[in-house]
């Protein structure tokens, strides 16, 4: 399935389940001083979750362009991205855990046809309800893991304060790790070990709390659902590749980078050239979207981040060219 076909399938699925389709918001958050960039699909919906504004519908769905600065230095490997698209379905006081788990499972296994035996679920350490719901879907107990917040199963807030809640993640099992380790034991491997065997593809956040800057929490006006599935990651699974850069849309940009630099992409060698071409590909795409949303290079704030991307891509390009 091509990336654009995946976009259409997702929106059609949730629109058929009475979700209002909402366009992607700008990468520059509107009226939210706590964030430099739009980092998640729920950002434009924060006022609805907090009870500050009335949503156009209680069920919403979107494909949101997101930008995260935390991964800038990691870009260059097979999967890290600063700019990505987040498939999301949201409930503002409407449905909760049962429906969100039902629909995530249905979309992945029935619409996309992903092998059920390849899916693992993680739940927050004390979330018995989510655990039981995944078990009813047929996931064996050894593939339903209880994780702490430190292991990634508590989401938010997106910024110094805001909505948050425990979450449940779905991971795809490729069957083999990426790392080479003679002591590797597949029976002890699990998603939190970061061996490359597992890829997180969907995060379901049970958003029922508001966290203040001092870390204290209180109940939101209603229990909400905020889910996010990485478009590029899902596309990699569906297209049978391990790298986001091998998916059809990113690969087309990477081919252009090969032509401009006159450097061949050889990921099997895991060399500096492959790393550099991935950086150029990713940062060029991020630059295009940021600039389209009004971000220009400068010495501070958002503009400084953009300038940093340009500098990093140029440095790697000149370094790679010198090696040729």
Give the label of every model feature segment.
Residues 1-306, 311-316:
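Alpha-helical segments
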